[in-house]
Amino acid sequence: MIRTLVAAGTVVALAMLGFAGVAPPAAALAGDTIVVTTTIQAAIDAAQPGDTVLVPPGIYRESVLVSKSHLRIVGSRAAVIDAEGFRTGIRVGTGRISRDGPSPACPPFEVEGFTLSGLTIKHASFSGAFLIGVDGYRLTGTRYVDNPVYGPFPVCSRKGLIDFNQVAGGGSAVGPSLDTGIYVGDDDQVTVRHNSVTNYVIGVVVENTIHATVQNNLLQGNTAGIYVAVLPDHPRPFTDDVVVERNQVLRNNLPNPVSPDSGDEIGGVPTGVGIVNLGSDHVVVRHNRILGNDSLGVIVLQNLFGPIDARIEPDPDFNQVRGNVLLQNGQHPDPVRAITPGADIVYDGTGTGNCFADNVFATEFPAGITALFPCGD
């Protein structure tokens, strides 16, 4: 059923125009379809759980809040949320991370089931799509343009899929991009696949998260490609069980626009980095192409933030780097931020159970380090 405030003839016209190739999931048939006629927010306010909000092509100058379960927002990329002047393009969930106790805590799950399919989101000052306290979500097929801090940004959520998105930062309308294209923080059971990210400080971050997969993405033209990391002052003080596979991590040599003296961790990211494992456990980096990153290809190292947060166990344990092609990395390391000489593979020797196998590479630091830590199978 289609519910709208306009005449039935207009509904037929909207159904015929502008939506080729954009269809809600089959499960959406269980609810109504609401066609946006004024603002996206008005349609969401009128929706009930199970409904699909269909967004016609056009420019929507607004920020959207979703606090209901089982909603779908669907449209072509010609449907544009221009969030200039707002922190977020779309926010799902109203909770916040509590800092009232001895440690930070995620909010309870508030929204069960959310899908964003298609659309373009641009110019949000903080993030294109911010999710918090969401149990089950999919962010798919969206174009994120010139959102200077984050594109998709799910935190304290679980059972998520982020796929087939195009995330590009650095537009002149809002200045340089200052953080991460796709950020996953304090999440559980998340897959990030078939996305392209360019012109951010970091392409994809998996931080303080468990049971995650990052696969078949294109990370090109960022300062760094992929970070799997543990940062201080988060609800979850560790990252565990992450697979990073079959990604193209190419020429991420964008100069970091954040000063290393800014006091922000992002300012310490060296220009020209492929994949980083910073103090995370059970991370498998396999079958990636990591080429032409000026400072380094892949690095496994001890967490630098242990002294800041006593809950963090700093060593990277039981990690594997295997079957990757790493070439022409480390040839022009960042003269200010680089913490090691340039190389295709860097390992600081800390932790337990880390290993390397079947990689194609030319340089490593320290020399001969990977032969000292072979994988047993």
Q: Where is each model-derived feature located?
A:
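Extracellular parallel beta-helix/beta-solenoid repeat domains
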Residues: 31, 35-377
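Secretory targeting and sorting signals
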Residues: 1-28
